[in-house]
């Protein structure tokens, strides 16, 4: 039976393999990444423009249910912006006090699909929204995970659907002696993050 450490190493190796496969896809789809910019070859970009659905046709063929739900989707934006603001302030003030490395927002909130030439303006706005919102959820989860490691690094008894990055460091549920002995060490152990720069 594999240990937890072995499984984590296996996951890291699979993530590295996935990254290598994604880089191969970049070559197949004629683009490369320079810093934070994605650059397509000119021929690929020209071809993409021919595949774009223009706005009038896009609206004409949109399903009614999609049109009717737009206000509900966009109503989520204000609470999301507020949460982004509050948690950024929280980690800016509290994490240095707790000696927790800050979460780099740009590692989670990635907005780049608006540069795709085969998307019309509505699709680009939708992609900006989804990139922001999903990235924000990852950013918030990482802030919460680091705060949880500091305040309550105990695994749950029940299975959790989506384990965050810090969960592997937590103490077992019901391990009272381990909690008393190891809490302070675990609370302050962010050694695996010390190479990450601040925002």
Residue ranges and their predicted role:
Residues 31-76:
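Compositionally biased, charge-rich terminal segments
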Residues 57-199:
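Cysteine-centered metal-binding/redox modules
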Residues 1-44:
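Short, non-transmembrane cytosolic segments of multipass membrane proteins
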């Amino acid at each position: 039976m594999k240990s937890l450490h072995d499984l984590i190493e296996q996951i890291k190796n699979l993530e590295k393999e996935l990254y290598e496969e994604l880089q191969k896809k970049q070559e197949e789809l004629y683009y490369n990444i320079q810093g934070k910019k994605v650059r397509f070859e000119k021929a690929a970009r020209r071809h993409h423009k021919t595949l774009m659905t223009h706005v009038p046709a896009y609206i004409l063929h949109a399903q009614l249910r999609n049109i009717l739900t737009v206000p509900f989707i966009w109503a989520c934006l204000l609470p999301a912006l507020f949460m982004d603001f509050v948690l950024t302030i929280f980690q800016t003030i509290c994490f240095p006090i707790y000696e927790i490395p800050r979460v780099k927002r740009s590692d989670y909130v990635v907005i780049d699909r608006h540069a795709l030439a085969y998307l019309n303006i509505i699709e680009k706005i939708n992609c900006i929204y989804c990139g922001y919102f999903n990235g924000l959820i990852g950013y918030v989860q990482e802030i919460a995970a680091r705060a949880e490691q500091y305040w309550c690094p105990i695994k749950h008894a029940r299975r959790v659907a989506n384990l965050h990055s810090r969960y592997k460091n937590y103490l077992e549920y019901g391990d009272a002696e381990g909690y008393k002995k190891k809490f302070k060490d675990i609370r302050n152990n962010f050694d695996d993050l010390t190479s990450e720069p601040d925002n």
